[in-house]
A protein has these predicted regions:
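Short Gly/Thr/Asp-enriched flexible loops that form oxyanion-binding sites at enzyme active sites
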Residues: 53-57, 146-152
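Basic polycationic patches enriched in arginine
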Residues: 25-29
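N-terminal phosphate-binding or glycine-rich loops at protein starts, especially the Walker A/P-loop
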Residues: 34-84
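Short glycine-rich or small-residue beta-strand-to-loop segments that form or flank ligand, phosphate
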Residues: 37-47, 103-105, 138-144
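Glycine-rich nucleotide/cofactor/substrate-binding loop typically near the N-terminus or early
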Residues: 66-135
Length: 152
């Protein structure tokens, strides 16, 4: 499964299926065929629960799906913009439950600044879309607060 566009839907993943939230109570379900490629990033201010949440998401994916890849973006949206990522393994999420912060790093990228060009004059949103498409991601998990979710 591969999304041609970055859409404005919330995705719920579990038990070998993907549901797209299409309204307050309606979900559409797709069977997952082949490898599922999940991008993950942490954004905004650092907080103690980011590692635990990443671990929970990863553990759920690895335990409920046979063929999944998790791609971690370094330093939040900046990693998505400039393709600074690493292929995560299940062992990367071991031993982080009680560690504060985030193993991926974080940066603040306010939504109001996303439409401004970067230092080389490139559109930040287009850079993120290009990385998403080039890596053939099926979805992006964004962990953070209000600003992170607004940017997502």
């Amino acid at each position: 499964m591969y999304n041609e566009i970055i859409c404005e839907q919330a995705w719920v993943i579990g038990m070998g299926h993907i549901w797209a939230a299409c309204g307050s109570r309606e979900y559409r379900r797709w069977e997952v065929e082949g490898m599922l490629r999940i991008g993950m990033l942490t954004s905004g201010g650092d907080c103690q629960s980011l590692n635990a949440t990443m671990r929970g998401v990863a553990k759920t994916l690895y335990n409920s799906m046979d063929d999944v890849e998790i791609i971690g973006f370094e330093e939040g949206y900046k990693g998505l913009m400039y393709a600074d990522y690493r292929m995560m393994k299940s062992t990367d999420f071991s031993g982080i439950l009680t560690e504060g912060g985030t193993i991926l790093g974080t940066s603040r990228q306010p939504f109001k600044l996303m439409r401004q060009p970067d230092e080389n004059g490139r559109d930040k949103v287009e850079l993120m879309k290009n990385t998403y498409r080039r890596l053939r991601l099926d979805c992006l998990v964004v962990l953070g607060g209000n600003g992170s979710q607004k940017t997502a």
